[in-house]
Amino acid sequence: MGIKIYKPTSPGRRHQTCSSFEEITTSTPEKSLLIKLKKSGGRNALGRVTSRHQGGGHKQKYRIIDFRRDKISIPAKVASIEYDPYRSARIALLHYVDGEKRYILAPLDLKVGDTVLSGPEADIKPGNALPLKAIPLGTIIHNVELKLGKGAQLARSAGTFAQLMAKEGRYSQVKLPSGEVRMVLQDCYATIGQVGNVDHEKVSLGKAGRARWLGKRPKVRGVAMNPVDHPHGGGEGRTSGGRHPVTPWGIPTKGYKTRTNKSTDRFIVKKRTK
């Protein structure tokens, strides 16, 4: 889980860093848990770009991850820690005692040979999944469900974690990585511990080509465009854009809040800080 630094043998190598992958135990994924996903290139069903700066990238196969953790009271042994091209976190292959195999997000300090369990009676140790009502206050958690039975939606990226702050009635208060404190049903499941691969944020791509391998296309600045393409475009020579920053469609950006009000806003106890 360390960071590998290279000697500056070329301009692209000079600032490049990458993960040492020392926690990876196998390079061969479980075939039964792989599916093919077709790349969209950021286009919708009409062929129009709805998400810019996406396209290309290395061919990948999607690993089916168990975000529900619904095999209650059935122990499983960690068979391997693997790389997943679709996410920043590492994944762990579980072999259940009934013969089934599943992938989960690999929490920090989970090792091959460890036993994990789901259910209210599980121990408070990394990798075990419990309902929030069975988790002590102050516990570091990740992979948190928002809706009962839907599967985990919160705190799934490398190095992230949430914290159980309080319990009141049917709801628990969970502090999320953004600083937001939110009420979540006490019957919703969460996994103990912090997501692994905590050094992911220290990785520097070093060159544009490495971003293209990941399916990321260039982001062209509005001031470098023509007036027909962007509100900041045009002008003689270099310009500042001449107005407060806006999107290509004229909506204020860079700090302007565009989040719409939702019926679930009543579950937010404290707004996000970052």
Swiss-Prot record:
SMART domains tied to this protein: Ribosomal_L2, Ribosomal_L2_C
Gene3D superfamilies: 2.30.30.30, Nucleic acid-binding proteins, Ribosomal protein L2, domain 3
One GO cellular component term: large ribosomal subunit
SUPFAM superfamilies: Nucleic acid-binding proteins, Translation proteins SH3-like domain
A Gene Ontology biological process term: cytoplasmic translation
Segments of this protein annotated with the region Disordered: 223-258
Keywords, ordered alphabetically: Ribonucleoprotein, Ribosomal protein, RNA-binding, rRNA-binding
GO molecular function, one term: transferase activity
Family note: Belongs to the universal ribosomal protein uL2 family.
Function text: One of the primary rRNA binding proteins. Required for association of the 30S and 50S subunits to form the 70S ribosome, for tRNA binding and peptide bond formation. It has been suggested to have peptidyltransferase activity; this is somewhat controversial. Makes several contacts with the 16S rRNA in the 70S ribosome.
Quaternary structure note: Part of the 50S ribosomal subunit. Forms a bridge to the 30S subunit in the 70S ribosome.
Protein name according to UniProt: Large ribosomal subunit protein uL2
Organism field: Pelobacter propionicus (strain DSM 2379 / NBRC 103807 / OttBd1)
